[in-house]
Amino acid sequence: MSKATLVIMAAGIGSRFGGGIKQLAPIGPNGEIIMDYSIYDALEAGFDKVVFVIRKDLEKDFKEIIGNRIEKEVEVAYAFQELDDIPEKFSGKFTGRTKPWGTGQAILCCKDVVDAPFLVINADDYYGKEAFKEAYAYLTNLPSTDIMQICMVSFVLKNTLSDNGGVTRGVCKVDGHGMLADIEETHNIEKEDGKAVIHKEDGDVFLDIDSP
């Protein structure tokens, strides 16, 4: 059994990216894709299994570009995100749906290939080494309890802003005990003069640039 599994969400259509498959676009000096960096950092942190959540029509390209290569370094499994892979009590209620479900259903699709504490990441985001170290340390030191243990690795807002325009971020709110209370999807956050600002018709809104 795996000590800690890395689950990579890679089934998204990527319609805003254009005609190519965003998750498989090379960005490194030797043709590396973003997942190469995430997997390298995860293995270095201690993760010993990788699960790719993909669409069935991406399988061939996925294996040719990254899957077959990664299998030489670590145990690899695939989960296919299908529209009808939902709890039985909901089957038949969404027969006309064509849009893929979100992250929750994608994780559910992994139920037959994940048997250990796991970390979920996006295929097209860069996280950095420290994020994987923090997650692995948490996942491999869980208390003995029947209560489900969940964590989230957050990033300080100022470290996620761009010099090239506004970005969308999930801004977190925590309670007095440091526990996550809310996540608000916030659009068009810009970095100006060391501040995080959203320009609106009725005035500028400033965010705490040191918030998670």
Model-assigned labels for residue ranges:
Residues M9-A10, A77-A79, V120-N122, Q149-V156:
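Short beta-strand segments
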Residues I70-P117:
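Short phosphate-binding loop-to-helix
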Residues G14, Y126-G128:
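A short, conserved beta-strand element in the Rossmann-like catalytic core
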Residues S2-G67, E71-V76, Q81, A116:
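N-terminal glycine-rich phosphate-binding loop and ensuing alpha1 helix
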Residues G14-G18, P87, L161-S162:
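Short N-terminal binding/cap micro-motifs at the start of the first secondary-structure element
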Residues A116-Y126:
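Short beta-strand-to-loop acidic/aromatic patch adjacent to the donor-nucleotide binding site
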Residues K129-P212:
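Conserved core of the sugar-phosphate nucleotidyltransferase
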